[in-house]
Amino acid sequence: MILLSNDRPLHRHVHLQCGSAASAILLLAMGPSFRRLVLKFSTPRLINVNIYAQGMQENEETWLPHLLGFILPIVTISGIYMGGWWCFSGFVYALGLCPIIDYFAPEISPTRAEVAKGPWNSLLFAHGLFFCASIGILLWRANLDGFTVPVILGGLSVGIVGGISGIINAHESGHRKKGSMIWRVARVNLFLVLYSHFTTEHNHGHHRNYATELDPASSPEGRGLWTQIVLTIPAQYKSAWKTHSTKGKTGISNPILHTTLLQLAFLGILFYISSSVMYAFLVQAALAIILLEYVNYMQHYGLRREVGERHTEMHSWEHRGIWSRWTLLELPLHPAHHLKASTPMWDLKAYEKSPQLPSGYYVCFWLAIVPPVWKRVMRKKLQAYSL
């Protein structure tokens, strides 16, 4: 147990229960500025830094830490504007630096007293605008330079922004009132990654069938990420189409057909402007979709219930690490989202009995893209929970 003061003349301390010597050393090495940052968003409670937390520590939080989520789009937009190899800066930040921060970040269950919805809704709206801006500057750079290696790297950077500020944001906003401004921003974001059918399939298919054999987004144990991606993308599209068909919207009246044709028309417009512009757009959309399906894959991997069986907090993987939570709009508190889909992100909570991922979302990405490693790590986790 390590006791760190806040380096100010206040009678307040934060106790850091470290799961490893490395965690403790890192936190100490970061010095007073880091400790002040932690304290700024903390109340004097236990903050658990153990990657495999045995208990659930709580901490009262506000919306302010979620401003960290804007680092990625700002870095990406700035890098593409500067051009050259700077176009890759968003990718390096998100999948290079963030996994390191994520690995050492404390695991904390958030608590919030009375919540003002305005700032939280503004976060969602801002994420949507940042994604649109990142798309715009990528297409500008592609039109200026052509489909060069730096532009491809810029497309990968924007793809990560699309996976977070675009799709994760749309995931949250897609559960809001249909026709509201935030809901409309979500529709635009999904259109810009060529995945407009996501809200239909997610809300009407996935939430009903998750962790069962009927859900194409829930992977059984033993299936690798790349196999899952190949199988789930067409299956989810088909499921979304079927959802509307069962409501009488068949053939040319099916909304999925309409959005598909609109997306194809948009690609045609981009190609008319420049083939380089269209190719850059496709690069970002492809990576954004891959990241979405990686998240789906990870969130329910190996967790199974029978069709019709009541769902519980044991049917989704959870992670309480502050870096993943703060930069991914509380998405890692996934069991709470499935227990009540209408719960906004600021009301999501951790569950003591929920199975815990081996690390945060950024770290798990590198595990998942190497299927043998992922399967070995998750086999141990599933055995630990007797699943």
Which residue stretches match the model-derived regions?
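Compositionally biased, intrinsically disordered low-complexity segments enriched in Pro/Arg/Gln/His
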Residues: R35-R36
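Intrinsic-disorder-associated, low-complexity terminal segments enriched in Asp/Asn/His/Tyr and depleted
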Residues: D7, H11-H15, N50
